[in-house]
Protein backbone atom coordinates (compact mmCIF):
# COMPACT_ATOMS: atom_id res chain seq x y z
CA UNK A 1 0.00 0.00 0.00
CA UNK A 2 1.41 3.38 -1.01
CA UNK A 3 1.56 5.91 1.81
CA UNK A 4 3.25 9.21 2.53
CA UNK A 5 3.99 7.95 6.05
CA UNK A 6 6.97 5.91 7.15
CA UNK A 7 6.04 2.45 8.31
CA UNK A 8 5.93 2.06 12.07
CA UNK A 9 8.54 -0.69 11.75
CA UNK A 10 10.92 1.67 9.94
CA UNK A 11 10.47 4.33 12.62
CA UNK A 12 11.27 1.83 15.38
CA UNK A 13 14.24 0.40 13.45
CA UNK A 14 15.71 3.87 13.13
CA UNK A 15 14.99 4.82 16.73
CA UNK A 16 16.79 1.80 18.20
CA UNK A 17 19.70 2.01 15.75
CA UNK A 18 19.17 -1.44 14.23
CA UNK A 19 20.93 -0.37 11.05
CA UNK A 20 21.64 -3.90 9.81
CA UNK A 21 18.00 -5.00 10.12
CA UNK A 22 15.23 -4.69 7.55
CA UNK A 23 11.80 -3.69 8.83
CA UNK A 24 8.24 -3.82 7.56
CA UNK A 25 4.69 -3.46 8.82
CA UNK A 26 2.20 -6.30 8.83
CA UNK A 27 -1.52 -5.74 9.32
CA UNK A 28 -3.67 -8.45 10.89
CA UNK A 29 -5.49 -6.45 13.59
CA UNK A 30 -5.99 -8.37 16.84
CA UNK A 31 -4.19 -11.42 15.42
CA UNK A 32 -1.23 -9.27 14.42
CA UNK A 33 1.34 -10.56 16.92
CA UNK A 34 0.57 -14.19 16.09
CA UNK A 35 0.70 -13.57 12.34
CA UNK A 36 3.90 -11.57 12.77
CA UNK A 37 5.55 -14.34 14.78
CA UNK A 38 4.60 -16.82 12.07
CA UNK A 39 6.31 -14.71 9.40
CA UNK A 40 9.35 -14.01 11.58
CA UNK A 41 9.78 -17.67 12.48
CA UNK A 42 9.82 -18.63 8.80
CA UNK A 43 12.56 -16.05 8.21
CA UNK A 44 14.81 -17.64 10.83
CA UNK A 45 15.90 -20.21 8.25
CA UNK A 46 17.89 -17.36 6.64
CA UNK A 47 18.39 -14.85 9.45
CA UNK A 48 19.57 -15.14 13.05
CA UNK A 49 17.25 -12.97 15.07
CA UNK A 50 14.14 -10.82 14.83
CA UNK A 51 11.74 -8.67 16.82
CA UNK A 52 7.97 -8.73 16.36
CA UNK A 53 6.10 -5.77 17.83
CA UNK A 54 2.36 -5.37 18.26
CA UNK A 55 1.41 -1.71 18.75
CA UNK A 56 -1.95 0.06 18.72
CA UNK A 57 -3.30 3.56 19.37
CA UNK A 58 -6.97 2.67 19.41
CA UNK A 59 -7.94 5.87 21.23
CA UNK A 60 -7.72 7.60 17.82
CA UNK A 61 -10.44 5.31 16.45
CA UNK A 62 -12.89 5.39 19.33
CA UNK A 63 -16.04 7.49 19.27
CA UNK A 64 -16.09 8.69 22.86
CA UNK A 65 -19.84 9.27 22.61
CA UNK A 66 -20.41 5.58 21.80
CA UNK A 67 -20.58 3.82 25.15
CA UNK A 68 -20.69 0.38 23.49
CA UNK A 69 -17.07 0.73 22.31
CA UNK A 70 -15.42 3.63 24.18
CA UNK A 71 -15.02 1.71 27.44
CA UNK A 72 -13.49 -1.38 25.80
CA UNK A 73 -10.26 -0.27 24.15
CA UNK A 74 -6.79 0.82 25.21
CA UNK A 75 -3.47 1.90 23.70
CA UNK A 76 -0.38 -0.26 24.07
CA UNK A 77 2.68 -1.90 22.56
CA UNK A 78 4.73 -5.03 23.23
CA UNK A 79 7.56 -6.80 21.46
CA UNK A 80 8.84 -10.36 21.29
CA UNK A 81 12.40 -11.24 20.26
CA UNK A 82 13.03 -14.61 18.63
CA UNK A 83 16.27 -16.17 17.44
CA UNK A 84 17.52 -19.25 15.68
CA UNK A 85 18.59 -22.05 18.03
CA UNK A 86 19.49 -25.72 17.94
CA UNK A 87 17.60 -26.33 21.19
CA UNK A 88 14.28 -28.16 21.14
CA UNK A 89 12.28 -25.00 21.79
CA UNK A 90 10.31 -22.54 19.72
CA UNK A 91 7.16 -22.75 17.61
CA UNK A 92 5.80 -26.30 17.76
CA UNK A 93 2.58 -25.87 15.79
CA UNK A 94 0.21 -23.22 14.49
CA UNK A 95 -3.04 -22.61 12.67
CA UNK A 96 -3.81 -19.31 10.88
CA UNK A 97 -7.18 -18.58 9.30
CA UNK A 98 -8.78 -15.57 7.60
CA UNK A 99 -12.50 -14.97 7.00
CA UNK A 100 -12.60 -11.96 4.71
CA UNK A 101 -16.27 -12.46 3.91
CA UNK A 102 -17.10 -11.60 7.54
CA UNK A 103 -14.81 -8.59 7.81
CA UNK A 104 -17.62 -6.03 7.93
CA UNK A 105 -18.51 -7.22 11.43
CA UNK A 106 -15.41 -5.56 12.89
CA UNK A 107 -14.05 -2.41 11.25
CA UNK A 108 -11.83 0.44 12.41
CA UNK A 109 -13.22 3.25 10.30
CA UNK A 110 -12.85 4.41 6.70
CA UNK A 111 -10.26 7.04 5.83
CA UNK A 112 -10.39 7.22 2.04
CA UNK A 113 -12.41 6.50 -1.06
CA UNK A 114 -12.57 2.73 -1.47
CA UNK A 115 -13.00 3.10 -5.26
CA UNK A 116 -11.55 6.39 -6.58
CA UNK A 117 -12.58 5.53 -10.17
CA UNK A 118 -16.30 5.33 -9.43
CA UNK A 119 -16.80 9.08 -9.43
CA UNK A 120 -18.60 8.81 -6.10
CA UNK A 121 -17.39 10.32 -2.86
CA UNK A 122 -17.47 7.89 0.03
CA UNK A 123 -18.76 9.09 3.38
CA UNK A 124 -15.75 8.91 5.70
CA UNK A 125 -16.27 7.40 9.14
CA UNK A 126 -13.09 7.32 11.22
CA UNK A 127 -14.54 5.42 14.15
CA UNK A 128 -14.43 1.83 15.28
CA UNK A 129 -17.59 -0.25 14.79
CA UNK A 130 -18.40 -3.84 15.61
CA UNK A 131 -21.29 -6.27 15.50
CA UNK A 132 -20.76 -7.60 19.01
CA UNK A 133 -23.03 -10.61 18.70
CA UNK A 134 -21.47 -11.80 15.43
CA UNK A 135 -17.92 -11.26 16.70
CA UNK A 136 -18.68 -13.22 19.88
CA UNK A 137 -20.21 -16.08 17.89
CA UNK A 138 -17.24 -16.05 15.52
CA UNK A 139 -14.70 -16.16 18.33
CA UNK A 140 -16.39 -18.92 20.32
CA UNK A 141 -16.78 -21.02 17.16
CA UNK A 142 -13.55 -20.48 15.20
CA UNK A 143 -10.98 -19.93 17.95
CA UNK A 144 -11.43 -23.39 19.53
CA UNK A 145 -11.15 -25.03 16.10
CA UNK A 146 -7.91 -23.20 15.29
CA UNK A 147 -6.47 -23.92 18.72
CA UNK A 148 -7.35 -27.59 18.47
CA UNK A 149 -5.64 -27.76 15.07
CA UNK A 150 -2.50 -26.08 16.43
CA UNK A 151 -2.38 -28.51 19.36
CA UNK A 152 -2.64 -31.48 16.99
CA UNK A 153 0.13 -30.14 14.75
CA UNK A 154 2.33 -29.60 17.81
CA UNK A 155 1.42 -33.06 19.16
CA UNK A 156 0.60 -31.44 22.49
CA UNK A 157 -2.42 -32.27 24.65
CA UNK A 158 -4.51 -29.41 26.00
CA UNK A 159 -3.67 -30.52 29.55
CA UNK A 160 0.06 -30.18 28.81
CA UNK A 161 -0.14 -26.46 27.98
CA UNK A 162 0.93 -24.42 31.00
CA UNK A 163 -0.79 -21.18 29.99
CA UNK A 164 -3.09 -20.01 27.23
CA UNK A 165 -2.47 -16.36 26.32
CA UNK A 166 -5.53 -15.25 24.37
CA UNK A 167 -6.15 -11.88 22.80
CA UNK A 168 -7.67 -9.78 25.56
CA UNK A 169 -10.97 -8.87 23.94
CA UNK A 170 -13.67 -10.19 26.21
CA UNK A 171 -13.64 -12.18 29.46
CA UNK A 172 -16.71 -14.16 28.39
CA UNK A 173 -14.93 -15.33 25.24
CA UNK A 174 -11.85 -16.40 27.20
CA UNK A 175 -13.95 -18.23 29.80
CA UNK A 176 -15.96 -19.97 27.09
CA UNK A 177 -12.81 -21.28 25.40
CA UNK A 178 -11.34 -22.47 28.72
CA UNK A 179 -14.55 -24.39 29.39
CA UNK A 180 -14.57 -25.82 25.85
CA UNK A 181 -11.12 -27.38 26.43
CA UNK A 182 -11.89 -28.48 29.98
CA UNK A 183 -9.10 -26.34 31.39
CA UNK A 184 -9.05 -24.35 34.65
CA UNK A 185 -9.53 -20.63 34.13
CA UNK A 186 -6.24 -20.04 36.01
CA UNK A 187 -4.45 -21.25 32.86
CA UNK A 188 -6.12 -18.42 30.90
CA UNK A 189 -4.76 -15.23 32.52
CA UNK A 190 -6.55 -11.97 31.74
CA UNK A 191 -5.67 -8.29 32.07
CA UNK A 192 -8.35 -6.56 30.00
CA UNK A 193 -9.84 -5.23 33.23
CA UNK A 194 -6.86 -2.91 33.66
CA UNK A 195 -5.52 -2.49 30.11
CA UNK A 196 -8.61 -2.82 27.96
CA UNK A 197 -8.50 -4.38 24.50
CA UNK A 198 -5.15 -3.34 23.01
CA UNK A 199 -5.60 -5.40 19.82
CA UNK A 200 -2.27 -6.63 18.40
CA UNK A 201 -0.45 -5.58 21.59
CA UNK A 202 -2.59 -7.54 24.04
CA UNK A 203 -0.87 -10.95 23.96
CA UNK A 204 2.60 -9.41 24.19
CA UNK A 205 1.65 -7.16 27.10
CA UNK A 206 0.15 -10.10 28.96
CA UNK A 207 3.26 -12.19 28.28
CA UNK A 208 5.52 -9.46 29.66
CA UNK A 209 3.43 -9.05 32.81
CA UNK A 210 3.49 -12.78 33.50
CA UNK A 211 7.24 -13.04 32.88
CA UNK A 212 7.93 -10.10 35.18
CA UNK A 213 5.84 -11.80 37.88
CA UNK A 214 7.80 -15.05 37.46
CA UNK A 215 4.68 -16.94 36.40
CA UNK A 216 5.91 -17.75 32.89
CA UNK A 217 9.46 -19.06 32.61
CA UNK A 218 11.66 -21.29 30.42
CA UNK A 219 10.65 -24.94 30.22
CA UNK A 220 6.95 -24.26 29.82
CA UNK A 221 4.54 -24.77 26.93
CA UNK A 222 2.51 -21.68 26.06
CA UNK A 223 -0.34 -21.08 23.62
CA UNK A 224 -0.73 -17.73 21.86
CA UNK A 225 -4.20 -17.18 20.40
CA UNK A 226 -5.21 -14.07 18.47
CA UNK A 227 -8.57 -13.32 16.89
CA UNK A 228 -10.36 -10.26 15.58
CA UNK A 229 -10.47 -7.88 12.64
CA UNK A 230 -10.32 -9.34 9.17
CA UNK A 231 -11.83 -11.48 10.47
CA UNK A 232 -8.75 -13.45 11.51
CA UNK A 233 -7.74 -16.22 13.89
CA UNK A 234 -4.25 -17.39 14.77
CA UNK A 235 -3.22 -20.06 17.29
CA UNK A 236 0.34 -21.08 18.10
CA UNK A 237 1.93 -23.54 20.53
CA UNK A 238 5.33 -22.44 21.83
CA UNK A 239 7.90 -24.36 23.83
CA UNK A 240 9.96 -21.76 25.68
Predicted features and spans:
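Catalytic phosphate/nucleotide-handling subdomain of diverse soluble enzymes
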Residues: 205-225, 233-240
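Active-site-proximal alpha-helical scaffold in enzymes
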Residues: 24-50, 80-82, 200-216
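A glycine- and small-aliphatic-rich helix-loop capping segment at beta-alpha/alpha-beta transitions
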Residues: 8-18, 41-45, 68-72, 181-183, ...
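Short, small-residue-biased leader/transition segments that mark boundaries at the very start
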Residues: 1-3
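Phosphate/pyrophosphate-binding loops at sites that engage ATP/ADP/AMP, CoA/4′-phosphopantetheine
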Residues: 145-162, 210-215
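Active-site nucleophile and cofactor-binding loops and adjacent substrate-binding regions
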Residues: 23-33, 72, 191-199, 226-227
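Condensing-enzyme catalytic core mediating Claisen C-C bond formation in acyl metabolism
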Residues: 66-137, 141, 145, 227, ...
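Flexible, glycine-rich active-site loops centered on histidine and acidic residues
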Residues: 41, 47-77
Amino acid sequence: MCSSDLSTAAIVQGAIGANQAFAFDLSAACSGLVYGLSVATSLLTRYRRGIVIGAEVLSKLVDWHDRTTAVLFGDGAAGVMIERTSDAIGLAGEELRTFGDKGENLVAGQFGNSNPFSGEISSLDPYFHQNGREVYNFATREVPEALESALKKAKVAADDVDFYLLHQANARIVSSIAKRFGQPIDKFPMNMGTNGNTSAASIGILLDELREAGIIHPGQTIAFVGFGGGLTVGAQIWKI
